[in-house]
Amino acid sequence: MNVTSKPGELVPESDVAAIMRGTHGDPFRVLGMHGGGGAPLSVRVFAPQAAEVAVLGQGGEVLAPLERIGAEGFFAGTVPGEEKFPYRLRFVSGPHEWEADDPYRFPEVLGELDEYLLGEGRHYQLYTRLGAHPAEIEGVQGVSFAVWAPNARRVSVVGAFNAWDGRRHPMRKRIGVGVWELFVPGLHTGDLYKYELLGPSGERLPLKSDPLSFAQEAPPATASVVHGLPEAEWHDAGWMQERESRQRRDAPISIYEVHAGSWRQGLDYDALAEELSAYVREMGFTHVEFLPISEHPFTGSWGYQPIGLFAPTARFGPPEGFARLVDRLHRDGIGVILDWVPAHFPSDAHGLANFDGTHLYDHADPRQGFHRDWNTQIYNFGRQEVANFLQASALFWLDRYHVDALRVDAVASMLYLDYSRNAGEWVPNRHGGRENLEAIDFLRGVNERVRLDHPGCITIAEESTAFPQVSRPVEDGGLGFGFKWNMGWMHDTLGYFRRDPIHRKHHQNDLTFGMVYAYSEDFVLPLSHDEVVHGKGSLIGQMAGDRWQKFANLRAYFGFMWAHPGKKLLFMGGEFAQEREWNHDASLDWHLLDDPSHAGMKRLVADLNREYRKRPALHRMDCDPEGFEWIDAGDSENSVLSFLRKAPGEKPVLAVCNLTPVVRSDYRIGVPEGGEWREILNSDAAIYGGSDVGNPGGLQAEEFSWHGRPASLRLTLPPLATIFVTPA
């Protein structure tokens, strides 16, 4: 049966019914202007909010009223003319009258190249096409929407502009790539929206946020916000030119890890730009690493269960605010590292889980697709569209926000199919092994794209296993990361400093074993947020001994860490010996700096950063075995160890650690050259809160062979302390 609204105008009743029910999968076949080329022109509109609809010409004149068909607001009618033309619509509802452009008169949003790249899984700037983009099409301002949902029966964009009615703005499906698109005239930056989808069986799914939204409502609200691609006003050209040299293996890299919400509570991005940047400059760190900034619904996840992989969290202001934060850090000579989470995603109803009514982003088999430790879904890295989505997210932060590095979270969980699973709870790879071959290929692909598209940017792996060549080039069989966190070093050394000094002589290996594998990867030494949560206590709280010994131990530990090969990372609060375990709902205890012991710790960390940056011997050969030499690793009876840090053509630095609360006088240590030496740093100095035992003034190396070296120094070793000594 056909419904006739005007002579020559036929609208299949089934199409009218499907549009009014909101189940039609091809709205452009029904709505908009049809005919031309000899056939009568007709216009069909679904407007349940209107009592009358008329078609207007380009000059605003009424060309034809449309006839209402049925009670649900479907209008149709013929209009004069032989070929299709731009038109507008006038709506009347009671005393209200308004005009608007018809979304269904506009052409396709995606081009042929977009379709090709999407089909290939190589649209690395996916964010320039999918998502919500303010645009002008045929002289009309509006917003272009596009979302991947290949298994959905119908997708609509909804918001206050259509009373969240999914029947009113159904989208066009690009069959070949499974992307739904629609240009909606009259929408603006700041408008809220979501997608309403019908699943494969026609079931209405929970409203979904846009996977490629550039802004989200502040949680607990969950709508996406229309926002164009970030277009910040950048002033960081100097940093960008120098960035590559500041992030090489031979550069000093000292990272301050920050949770933006609890460093100092109540700060937005702009306040952080002022206060955090000034503080990091004062402390001498080279980089700030932010716990995940991408939008996440649950604050207690610290950002590690993100949903908005292209949206800075709205908790601290708009996206432009985050750009200004990065810009300010760069202008102050500080690099920016973001924690990035491609391993898994939360199952919140408005997110990626069951996005189009299927396991679109994850695996249907829970042995592959569900992470029991975190109650999250695991991405299907073998699906090229999913890999492309994640790759585009990584590149987005580097491209649009000038981020310098990505610290990739939970890499170990990606690399192994049996990660945290018992026998029978995982599916072997095609060779029968436990390695996740698709994830390995994905990580290599991301790292290669970063290297090719953003030279000078780096990636850093949080990887806790012995998986080989994590930080080696892809062409050499590696994963292609720039650096890897040295979790083994952290575990061993932190365990050592938890021990009572009386027992340490039996555990010297905890401090020395790290050098056995120190150059198997390019390492970062991490004292991260993970070490000060879940009942572990603060760093200072984990140190052995009474209050004085705890502070002395932590100062000695920091001295050992800054002297040890590897880049440095310290979580906020550790630098001044925060005493409470970290709480994401509270600020750091800045009032502790009124206590000389805490203020002294802060000064020590600043001085360690200064020495580390100033002295090539301490950083240039961090990743080269030629930059390290044991003097004596074997004096376990006294819990003393000594080693040299070196760089070609530079003065060496001798580090000596005395890790019992006993002063050791006239302690002889072999050195590579005679002449005058001097103590340049002493963690026991009074300015750091120590007992001020040490080696003031100059030190004369004696021509007395010791430890296999031609000369030696007689030192006073302060209790529970690390000292640095160098030729004068």
Swiss-Prot record:
Gene Ontology CC: one annotated term: cytosol
UniProt pathway annotation: Glycan biosynthesis; glycogen biosynthesis
Identification of the protein by name: 1,4-alpha-glucan branching enzyme GlgB
Subunit structure and binding partners: Monomer.
Catalyzed reaction equations: Transfers a segment of a (1->4)-alpha-D-glucan chain to a primary hydroxy group in a similar glucan chain
Keyword flag Ligase: no
Organism annotation: Cereibacter sphaeroides (strain ATCC 17023 / DSM 158 / JCM 6121 / CCUG 31486 / LMG 2827 / NBRC 12203 / NCIMB 8253 / ATH 2.4.1.)
Function recorded in the entry: Catalyzes the formation of the alpha-1,6-glucosidic linkages in glycogen by scission of a 1,4-alpha-linked oligosaccharide from growing alpha-1,4-glucan chains and the subsequent attachment of the oligosaccharide to the alpha-1,6 position.
Active site: D409, E462
Lineage of the species this protein comes from: Bacteria, Pseudomonadati, Pseudomonadota, Alphaproteobacteria, Rhodobacterales
